[in-house]
Amino acid sequence: MNLQEQILYYYKKKKYNCSETIIHAANDVYSLNLDKDSMKMLAGFGSGMYSGKTCGALIGCVAVLSKLFIKEKAHDQLSEFRKAIQLCVRNFTEDLGDTECKNIRPHSYDPNLHCLYTVQKAGMALESTIAEIKKEYELESDMIPLK
């Protein structure tokens, strides 16, 4: 399955929140090798940390990029890692207009589908970011070997 299919599965069928959906879907697609217990760390980021702040789907994307990029700590690869995160935030914002849940929900939330549209757009932003990084560094694998 591709990322969008996995997003639909985890969000609609398994009923995970936005950040949980992104990490679970990406774990399957990009073989992140995260166990179920570790992925629970993203649970509290749903609905912008349940306070309308930074979108949980975007936080999920940043978590995925962290797992793909970082060998030991961010400071060891800061210039490349910073660029990847900034690209992801840019791609996300271009599609959804903001990074704050409270500003995204009014135009993206559906009473029946909830935040599915936002999570799908976040997945697209993640995929675009990975593609841009792979192109820049002439990489073939989804795993970003800047480690």
Segment roles from a protein language model:
Residues 44-67:
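Glycine/serine-rich anion-binding loops at beta->alpha junctions
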Residues 81-147:
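C-terminal binding/interaction regions
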Residues 2, 17, 21, 36, ...:
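Conserved active-site and cofactor/substrate-binding residues in soluble primary-metabolism enzymes
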Residues 13-16, 52-53:
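Structural motif
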Residues 24-28, 63-70, 124-128:
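Short glycine/serine- and small hydrophobic-enriched flexible loop segments
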Residues 1-14:
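Polybasic, low-complexity association/targeting segments
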